[in-house]
Amino acid sequence: MKMKKCPKCGKYTLKDFCSECNEKSVTVKPPKFSPVDKYGKYRRALKKAKM
């Protein structure tokens, strides 16, 4: 089972067709990998604050 997205309305679903507009849903592409972590300092600060 893969996460899918409706190209027409943008709703995420697990079904082959969107439940709102009956458009065929497509497989979502994963975000592009980058070794530069833009949000790493914020994530580490939040983790440190929780400890």
From Swiss-Prot:
Recorded GO CC terms: ribonucleoprotein complex
InterPro entries cross-referenced by the UniProt entry: H/ACA_rnp_Nop10, H/ACA_rnp_Nop10_sf, Nop10_arc-typ
Top-rank lineage group of the source organism: Archaea
GO molecular function list: snoRNA binding
Any single GO BP term: pseudouridine synthesis
Record's keyword terms, sorted: Ribonucleoprotein, Ribosome biogenesis, rRNA processing
Job of this protein: Involved in ribosome biogenesis; more specifically in 18S rRNA pseudouridylation and in cleavage of pre-rRNA.
Protein family membership: Belongs to the NOP10 family.
Identification of the protein by name: Ribosome biogenesis protein Nop10
Organism for this UniProt entry: Methanococcus maripaludis (strain C6 / ATCC BAA-1332)
Gene name per UniProt: nop10
